[in-house]
């Protein structure tokens, strides 16, 4: 298995790659996550951002496997990225309260040695419990809402908001491991030998 360059500073993606024992190093992308400037469906926008992140790092390293990913939350056709501030986080959590939403991760794998680009996405459906204002404000005060699409961490305290999940759990954490495994196999890279 060749070493992967993760084009992300996300500690959650780092943890997920460590979980499946992949050899990797981290070189974060400098790309601004400005999804509103992109065109297409939410899934296509997530794919485009994952590609931009991978391409940015590929231009720096010029060889090997580069992994880019971008996770967004979609509810009622509205894309929720990372909250800008407490008010933004509050509004996002209020929208998610008692409803089902989509978590979409665009994933891009660039094999620079063989000039192959794989770009895909994974969608997981997450249903939230009803959240009262007190719970939302306490969660925001904890600090966990920040730096995460949709203002919650399903692998943290935010798990108490999740009533149900349809699809890939690791996708809502930030990286769909099953999809990544399939993409690596297309490049003849085996996670399990």
Curated annotation (Swiss-Prot):
Keyword Transmembrane helix applies: no
Pfam annotation, one family: Maf
Key word Cytoplasm present: yes
A GO CC term assigned to this protein in UniProt: cytoplasm
Active-site residues per Swiss-Prot or TrEMBL entry: 70
Family: Belongs to the Maf family. YhdE subfamily.
HAMAP family per the UniProt record, alphabetical: Maf (MF_00528)
Name the record gives this protein: dTTP/UTP pyrophosphatase
Annotated organism of origin: Ruminiclostridium cellulolyticum (strain ATCC 35319 / DSM 5812 / JCM 6584 / H10) (Clostridium cellulolyticum)
């Amino acid at each position: 298995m060749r070493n992967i360059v993760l084009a992300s500073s996300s500690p959650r993606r780092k943890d997920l790659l460590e979980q499946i024992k992949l050899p990797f190093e981290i070189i974060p992308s400098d790309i601004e996550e400005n999804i509103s400037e992109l065109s297409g469906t939410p899934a296509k926008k997530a794919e485009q951002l994952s590609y931009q992140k991978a391409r940015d790092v590929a231009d720096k390293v010029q060889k090997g496997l580069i992994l880019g990913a971008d996770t967004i939350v979609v509810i009622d056709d509205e894309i929720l990225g990372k909250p800008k501030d407490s008010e933004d986080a509050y509004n996002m959590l209020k929208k998610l309260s008692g409803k089902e939403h989509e978590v979409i991760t665009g994933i891009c794998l660039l094999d620079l040695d063989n000039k192959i680009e794989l770009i895909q996405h994974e969608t997981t459906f997450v249903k939230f419990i009803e959240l009262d204002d007190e719970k939302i404000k306490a969660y925001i005060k904890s600090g966990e809402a920040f730096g995460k699409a949709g203002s919650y961490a399903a692998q943290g305290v935010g798990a108490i908001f999740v009533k149900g999940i349809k699809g890939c759990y690791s996708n809502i954490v930030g990286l769909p491991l099953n999809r990544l495994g399939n993409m690596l196999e297309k490049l003849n890279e085996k996670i399990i030998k």
